[in-house]
């Protein structure tokens, strides 16, 4: 079964707004170490893909390449038949750190970098993540989970077609993490954007994604479709079996030293507004 057909079981049955991605021979080298090794990957429009692997395997490096925060040493990154760089305005990125500006109120963080009459749109984005009533508060008054909801609203206001998630839930408690997973999944089903989620949490990957990709020492070691109906029952035997399959592969790999994060080509404020 090809990757496109494998996605159909979980991808929302509606007109896809997401960006289709194609990576062709993508590699990234830091000095003598090749972190990514000729990655070939096709992601259909509107698919939810989770990327897992041990620390240092290259998964966050891959996400930075897709976000345009770094450049490949070789290979092509495509959005459909065009260069992915041409779709930057349709791409948004969330980090583990919410990166809210503490001197700006919640609604102003959501509208960061926008011009014109954006406040109604920002309030709508906050309403979508359940925080409309906190619009005029300061970030310091919010919990960690609420700050990540604001970061998600900041991405949603741009109506992204590609949402890149770099372990955005890693610092949250277990219950808040599940609530955020359900929120992200619900918004994905509603809006149809393409999602790539980097996570250390295998159970999270299997619970929310159409497809789980394991990076092993810079290469795709496993590309596993998750063909389960939504919403998924976290206690199901099938979900547990898929989780065990991926986890056993992850644990069989050694942990590698982390890669240095390259200097972003984007101004700091624009990175935070991603």
Swiss-Prot record:
It is found in: Cell inner membrane. ATP binds at residues 53-60. It catalyses: ATP + H2O + aliphatic sulfonate-[sulfonate-binding protein]Side 1 = ADP + phosphate + aliphatic sulfonateSide 2 + [sulfonate-binding protein]Side 1. It comes from the Bacteria. Pfam families: ABC_tran (PF00005). InterPro entries: AAA+_ATPase, ABC_transporter-like_ATP-bd, ABC_transporter-like_CS, ABC_transporter_ATP-bind, P-loop_NTPase. The keyword rRNA-binding does not apply. SMART domains: AAA (SM00382). Residues 21-242 form the ABC transporter domain. Belongs to the ABC transporter superfamily. Aliphatic sulfonates importer (TC 3.A.1.17.2) family. Part of the ABC transporter complex SsuABC involved in aliphatic sulfonates import. Responsible for energy coupling to the transport system. This is Aliphatic sulfonates import ATP-binding protein SsuB 1. It comes from Pseudomonas aeruginosa (strain ATCC 15692 / DSM 22644 / CIP 104116 / JCM 14847 / LMG 12228 / 1C / PRS 101 / PAO1).
